[in-house]
Amino acid sequence: MRIQAIRGVKDIMPDEIEKWRWVENKANQVFTRYGFKEIRLPIFEKTKLFSRGIGETTDIVEKEMYTFEDRGGEKVTLRPEGTASVVRAFIEHKMYTKQTVQKYYYLGPMFRYERPQAGRFRQFYQIGVEAMGTHNPSIDAEVMVMLMDFFNILKLKKFELQINSLGCNKCRPAYRETLKKSISKHLSDLCENCN
């Protein structure tokens, strides 16, 4: 019996590598131009980092993480996303003591136990950015402009930038109440998990 790749993962063959390197190099060029520095993150972390960071009741934590016990009995998880690991590294290495705004980007494989289908794999590659140390919304605008630059360099033709906001710390409680009132009219339409 031949051993094949596990369902939901994909080999990146030599004829595809140049395209991957080109995208990664363009990401590096664009992000460093905006002052973002690359950070390389571990492939696996303590499970509690993701359950705390992403939220214990999210689909990612409840259904999609690859979690196992290591030989020492510690629960570890293959990273499902990069944000929690960046925050952990930021705190662990006291990066908050360096300068006010810290800007990082990462790229690499992520892992989620999802039903494989077109464009959705259990091991997938993600490029992400994180900016910490400021509540100024101008950093969000900078990230959006930077990503538009990146997408244009990649010559992506069909993409749409959609912007959403939960509001600032002062306005967020009123926003939540308005949202709750709006949703309460439709609670009977929601499943048990969402209700």
Regions found by a protein language model. Name each.
Residues 1-195:
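TRNA-recognition modules of translation machinery and tRNA-sensing kinases, especially anticodon-binding
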